[in-house]
Amino acid sequence: EMATKLVAARLLTAEAARAKESGQRADMLSGMAKLFASETAKEVCEDALRIHGGYGYINEFMVERLYREAPLYIVGEGTNDIQKIVIARRIIDDSEVDVLGLPQ
């Protein structure tokens, strides 16, 4: 489950980068990638800490640092609440955006 979430976060980030590099508007995809990847990082770090048990809190284990730093990704470069607003505005304002792949 943890690996699946991490791969999905990487793929979404790569798709946002591909859109940006090809000159397409990438604000929505970038916001989605940041939102999903930062939430995933926090969830995966929490799971890793549980797996390590008490050792997860010891500075000698990398999971302690990752667990401590993961919430910072949610705040950096615009909080996830701001990312949700960016995504929603793009979907509402642009009729060309077809997020679900449904006929319009």
Residue ranges of predicted features:
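Alpha-helical interface subdomain recognition
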Residues: 1-104
